[in-house]
Amino acid sequence: MDKIEVRGARTHNLKDINLTIPRDKLTVITGLSGSGKSSLAFDTLYAEGQRRYVESLSAYARQFLSLMEKPDVDHIEGLSPAISIEQKSTSHNPRSTVGTITEVYDYLRLLYARVGEPRCPTHHAPLAAQTVSQMVDKVLELPEGSKMMLLAPIVKERKGEHVKTLENLAAQGFIRARIDGETCDLSDPPTLELHKKHTIEVVVDRFKVRPDLQQRLAESFETTLELSGGIAVVAPMDGDGEEIIFSANFACPQCGYSMQELEPRLFSFNNPAGACGTCDGLGVQQYFDPSRVIQDDSLSLAQGAIRGWDQKNYYYFQMLTSLADHYGFDLHAPFNSLPKKTQDVILKGSGRTEIEFKYINDRGDIRVKRHPFEGILNTLERRYRDTESNSVREELAKYISTKSCSSCGGTRLRLEARNVFIADTTLPEIVELSIADALTFFQTLKLEGQRAQIAEKVMKEINDRLQFLVNVGLNYLNLSRSAETLSGGEAQRIRLASQIGAGLVGVMYVLDEPSIGLHQRDNERLLKTLTHLRDLGNTVLVVEHDEDAIRCADHVIDIGPGAGVHGGNVVAEGTMDEIIANPNSLTGQYLSGAKEIAVPKERTPRDPKKTVELLGATGNNLKNVDLSIPVGLFSCITGVSGSGKSTLINDTFFKIAHTQLNGATTAHPSPYKSIKGLEHFDKVIDIDQSPIGRTPRSNPATYTGIFTPIRELFAGTQESRSRGYKPGRFSFNVRGGRCEACQGDGVIKVEMHFLPDVYVPCDVCKGKRYNRETLEVRYKGKTIDEVLEMTVEDARTFFDPVPAIARKLQTLMDVGLSYIRLGQAATTLSGGEAQRVKLARELSKRDTGKTLYILDEPTTGLHFHDIQQLLTVLHRLRDHGNTVVVIEHNLDVIKTADWIIDLGPEGGQGGGEIIAQGTPEDVSQIEGSHTARFLKPMLK
C-alpha cells in the first residue's frame, strides 16, 4: 500500500472531497486561512489515524487516553498510527523545562549518577569511603548520655506493601523498625498502602552515648552496613535534633560530610530526593514585593503611598499613627524622604520591640494594646496564606513577585546534587549553557577507562538529542529554560526534535506550520529535519504557507478556492510544477510570480525629530541595546530566532509603554535605563496570538462588541417592546432569555468512560441556546440564534443599514475573516484567527492617529493572499498617523516596511545587539546581517 485514499471527507467546511496522498512522502497542505487545511490534516486524517490505533487497545487502556471524535468521512484506507505536532504552547507546568520535554535531562541525570564525582560542598574535596572506626569515633563525639538509635535503611522511597521485607526482618531477630518516620514494633507492623512510596529503616541498636561503647558500636555498625549496603543512620530516639548519615561509600575526609549513593533521582527536581527543600524544585520563591506594594513613594503615608493604609482606612491608619508616635516620624512627609530604618519598620515590622497601639472604635472608646508591629509585607503575607476567599487572594497576588530561590540559587536542586562534577562541571552549569555550547561540551568530553565505557551509550543519546535541537534551529535555548516561556513555534520544534529522537518508522506525522518564528536562515535546517523524518520511512503531512516548504514537498495539496463556506474543495494537487500550471490555484499564481505582494513604489520618509528612544535595555540576552523607533511609520523588527526581538519589544518596550500610557500596574518591564518620546502616543495596543477567550461562550460577536448593539436591535422590535424584553433577554450568559436546560451552551457534555466525552445538542433548545419565547422575536425575519449562525460576510449585508454594526463587521472582512461565524466559539479559532479578531476590534475603534500598535508575527497561519490583505490594513493604520511595530520573519512583510531594525547576529548569547537599521534598501546592503542576505533578492 503506497498511498492513503480519502473518500467523502465532510469535516467542518470540507465539501465531500476525495484525494490520494502518497505514503512515506513529504506532503504540504496549503491554501487560504480558513479554507479547511486543518480540517483535512488534523480533524480528519490525524483524528482517524489516532482513533483507529486507540480503538485497538483494551477498554482498560482506553480510559487513560483521550479518544478523538470519529470524523465525518466515508472511507479512509492506508492510514498509519498518527502523531500530531501542533502549535499549542507546550505546558503551563512550571516544572517543565526544555531539558525535561526533550528527555535530554533524563540522560544527564543518568550520566551524573553513573560517572559523576561527588565533592564536599565546604572543602570541595572528592568524597571518600568512611571506615567503621571513623563512624564509631564520630558517634562517641556526641554529648555523653544522648539517647540514640542506629538504623539500617532497607527500603528507600519505594511503592508497595513490603510485607515480605518486614517478615524477613522480624525473622532475623530485629524488634523495631522506623517506617515513614514513625518507630513501630516488627511483631505488629502497620499495613502499608500499596500505591504510596515508603521508607523502611530497621533499628539495629539503641544506646546511650558513653566512652565504653566502642566494641558494641563497631559490631552494630558492621551489621548495619551489611544490611543496608553501606549506609548507616544515627538518629536521636526522641526524634528531635540532627540525624547523622554514615556511608561506607562516600564521605569528606575533613568534615565527614557524606551522602547517599548517587542515583538518577538525586538529580531530579521533580523528586523529593533531589529537589531543593526551600523552593520544592521550582527554582523561584514568591514574595510580597515592596516596589509593588508602595504605589507612589513621592506621596506621604497619609496621602496613600501604600494602598489600603491611608487615612481612608481608619483601622490600619490608627496603627501607623501609633507607630509614628513611637518612632517619631511624620505621616505627612513623602515616603521616600523617611529614613531607610523607618521604611523597614513600616514594611517589615518592629521585630520584638513592643509598641503601644491606641484603637478608637465608632463610639469613641479608646483601647490601648502593647504588641510588636507585624509590618505591612508580613500582614499581606498572612492574609494571603490564611484567606479562603478567591477574590482576596487575586487582589493580593498583584503585589507578589518571584525571585530566584535563596537556597539553591535558582538551580532547583538540593545541595548534594549541586556538588557532583564531571570534568569540573556540575549538572546545573550544564543546563545553563546554550544547547549549542552543551553539544560542544559533550563532543569534546574525554573520560578515562571504566567511566568512559559506562558513559558511552548515555553520551551518544545526549549528543543525538542536542544535535536534533540544533537542527531545528533551537541552538540558542538552554536546557533549563521553562516550557511556559517558549513561543508556539519553539514548542512545536522541540516536540519535533523529540520525535526524531524517538526514531519511529511507519508513522504518519501531522505538523502545523513548523516554520513559525523561524528566520529564513534556519528554515533550511528545519526542512532537512522534515525530509529526514520522511527518509526514516514515515509519511509527513505539513500544513504550511512557507514558499520554501512548498517547493521542497514531494506532493502539494491546495485547498480552497476561498475561506470558510467558500473553501473546502481541493483546488489543485500534485507536484510543485503541477500546482503552478493549474490556473485555478491561487497558491500557484503566487509561486509562479503571476501574482505578488509588491514592493511599495516609495517609502514613507522618517522624521528624525519624531522618534521613541529606549536606552540601555539589558533583559535576557540584550547587550545594553539602544532602540530608536520612528513615530508614524510601519517598522519591522527582524533577526534570527533567539536574537532578542521578543525581549526587546514585548518584555521591555511594550511593558514600559503599557505602564506609562495605559496606566498598567502589573506590567514589569525587563531592565532598561531610560525612555523618551512616548508623549507622541495616547495609548499602546499589543495584538498577540493568545486566545480571545477560553470558553465556548466567548465568540467574535461578544469580543468585538457587535453583540451588544445586535441585542439592542432585537430589544427594540415591536414584539420585544410589547413583551417588555430588554437587551439582557437576548444574552445566553444570564438567566431570562437563555435555555436553562443547557444554561445557554447549546450542548450538554456527557462523560463517557472508555470513550471521548460526547457533546450532544441540548434536547430542549435543539442547540439554539435560547428558550422558545426569546426565539419568537424576529428582526428582519431572523431570530437571534440565526444571526449568531451567520458568517461575517452574510451579516455585513444583513446589517448594512446599521452603521455601528456594519463598520465593525467590515473590519472583520478587511482582516480576511469573512468566513467565520459571529457566534463561533473562541476555542475553535486558530492563533492567527484570534489575532486578527483582536486586530479587527482595534481597527473598529475611533482612530486618534496617535496609537502605537505592536504585533508579534501577525502572518502566522496566513496564505500569500491573506498577507496582502493584512498589509493593506497595517498600511491603513500607518497612513492615519499611527505607529505600527511588527516582529516578523516573513520577507513579504519585511520588504513593505518603512523601517527595519535587525537584531543579531546570532541567537542566544551570540545575539542581543542591533546590527542593522534603516529602510529595507539600506538594510539589504549590510554585511553580516542574515536578514539582509535573504531580503536583497526580494527588492529587485
Curated annotation (Swiss-Prot):
> Residues in domain ABC transporter?
309-586, 606-936
Q: Which InterPro entries match?
A: ABC_transporter-like_ATP-bd (IPR003439), ABC_transporter-like_CS (IPR017871), ATP_grasp_subdomain_1 (IPR013815), P-loop_NTPase (IPR027417), UvrA (IPR004602), UvrA_DNA-bd (IPR041552), UvrA_inter (IPR041102)
Task: Tell me which HAMAP family the record gives.
Answer: UvrA
What do the Gene Ontology cellular component annotations say?
Answer: cytoplasm; excinuclease repair complex
Question: What is this protein called in UniProt?
Answer: UvrABC system protein A
Q: Report whether Zinc shows up as a keyword of the record.
A: yes
Q: Keyword check for Lipoprotein, yes or no.
A: no
Which Pfam families does the UniProt entry name for this protein? ABC_tran, UvrA_DNA-bind, UvrA_inter
